């Protein structure tokens, strides 16, 4: 194996966005994969399951023989062509299986028979995964500054503008609230953690890093939860709180949740299906917090939402949404965040408008 494939180079592979031809079964890939990996399995889920059962009952030799019988002829040729095409597309890529074992070696051998010498990852995905976990733990020990503030304060934008800012919500593909989902589905927990680790490694490699700047998040962002090592550090971190006028927050929320989300849904699905998806998205966000609102208040706000959607559909105006958004902020989101922030009052080091906080960050 070349030096670049040895254990001490795993971080370099991740930092370089090295393309990975991941030959694990789809179910394994879905449970966790590295950024930049493409899944071109040696065996599909049912084939892998059959080989696993055979291994338990009859041993390694019988399982290997079964694998070769399952992946032969046209099936073998089709998969081989896919690996060849992937290598031609990514000539600096690597083969990767679970542990750098038989699957990646078999694919490597088959490719070599066609004249392609494709390297593989020693230790496989599990070695890269351990590297990602260790990197997150190590880099989370650096000082952290949190950006706090009520919904609509522009916290994410502020974080993105910092050279040492890490957009946790962007990595999670979710904006944190019940209305936070995007058109891109969230990654599995392991894939989210891997993506976060690579982002930390990249920023650390390219910045003179005094500290991380992160948004003040809870334990979870949608379906993804923050690594405990990072969460523990965030719980003790100083906080700069954005306190913008309510009207300005409303305009940010109008742009983000009504104008942009409507545009994104219709762009992705067309006018009719996109409108339906947009409507369902807003209804789902409200439905998700119905118990906290109380069923009567939930029903009232749902009626108001329906009227606002009808107005938006007929005239294009999003003004009607303010009739349910304003009480939702006043009665639910703002009191909830202020309660959470009060428990961390000792950690607050600065308060001011969005621009005040932006200027303060430049001076630090």
UniProtKB/Swiss-Prot annotation:
Domain Rhodanese: residue ranges: 14-137
Catalytic activity line of the entry: 5-methylaminomethyl-2-thiouridine(34) in tRNA + selenophosphate + (2E)-geranyl diphosphate + H2O + H(+) = 5-methylaminomethyl-2-selenouridine(34) in tRNA + (2E)-thiogeraniol + phosphate + diphosphate; 5-methylaminomethyl-2-thiouridine(34) in tRNA + (2E)-geranyl diphosphate = 5-methylaminomethyl-S-(2E)-geranyl-thiouridine(34) in tRNA + diphosphate; 5-methylaminomethyl-S-(2E)-geranyl-thiouridine(34) in tRNA + selenophosphate + H(+) = 5-methylaminomethyl-2-(Se-phospho)selenouridine(34) in tRNA + (2E)-thiogeraniol; 5-methylaminomethyl-2-(Se-phospho)selenouridine(34) in tRNA + H2O = 5-methylaminomethyl-2-selenouridine(34) in tRNA + phosphate
Active site: 97 (s-selanylcysteine intermediate)
GO biological process: tRNA wobble uridine modification
Coiled-coil positions: none
EC number: 2.9.1.3
Keyword presence, Transferase: yes
Matching Gene3D superfamilies: Rhodanese-like domain
Family matches, as CDD domains: RHOD_YbbB
Cross-referenced PROSITE patterns: RHODANESE_3
Keyword Repressor: no
InterPro entries recorded: Rhodanese-like_dom, Rhodanese-like_dom_sf, SelU
Protein name: tRNA 2-selenouridine synthase
Protein species of origin: Salmonella paratyphi A (strain AKU_12601)
């Amino acid at each position: 194996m070349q030096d670049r494939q040895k254990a001490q180079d795993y971080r370099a592979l991740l930092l370089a966005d090295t393309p990975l031809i991941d030959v694990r079964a789809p179910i394994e890939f879905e449970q966790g994969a590295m950024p930049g990996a493409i899944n071109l399995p040696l065996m599909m889920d049912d084939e892998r399951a059959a080989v696993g059962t055979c291994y338990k009952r009859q041993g390694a030799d019988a399982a290997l023989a079964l694998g070769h019988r399952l992946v032969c002829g046209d099936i073998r040729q089709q998969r081989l062509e896919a690996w060849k095409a992937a290598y031609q597309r990514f000539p600096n890529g690597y083969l990767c299986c679970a542990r750098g074992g038989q699957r990646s070696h078999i694919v490597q051998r088959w490719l070599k028979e066609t004249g392609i010498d494709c390297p593989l990852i020693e230790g496989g995905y599990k070695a890269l995964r351990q590297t990602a976990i260790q990197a997150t733990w190590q880099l989370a020990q650096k000082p952290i500054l949190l950006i706090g503030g009520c919904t609509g304060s522009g916290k994410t934008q502020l974080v993105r503008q910092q050279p040492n800012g890490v957009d946790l919500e962007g990595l999670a593909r979710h904006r944190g609230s019940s209305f936070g989902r995007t058109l891109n589905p969230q990654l599995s927990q392991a894939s989210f953690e891997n993506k976060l680790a690579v982002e930390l490694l990249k920023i650390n490699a390219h910045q003179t890093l005094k500290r991380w700047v992160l948004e003040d998040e809870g334990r979870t962002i949608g379906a993804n939860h923050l690594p405990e090592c990072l969460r523990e550090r965030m719980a003790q971190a100083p906080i700069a709180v954005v306190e913008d006028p309510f009207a300005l927050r409303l305009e940010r929320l109008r742009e983000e949740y009504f104008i942009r989300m409507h545009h994104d849904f219709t762009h992705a699905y067309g006018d009719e299906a996109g409108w339906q998806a947009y409507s369902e998205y807003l209804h789902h966000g409200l439905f998700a917090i119905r118990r906290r609102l109380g069923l009567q208040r939930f029903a009232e706000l749902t009626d108001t939402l329906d009227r606002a959607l009808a107005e938006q559909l007929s005239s294009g105006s999003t003004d009607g949404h303010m009739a349910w958004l304003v009480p939702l902020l006043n009665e639910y989101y703002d009191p909830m965040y202020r309660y959470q922030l009060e428990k961390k009052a000792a950690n607050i080091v600065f308060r001011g408008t969005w621009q005040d906080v932006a200027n303060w960050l430049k001076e630090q």
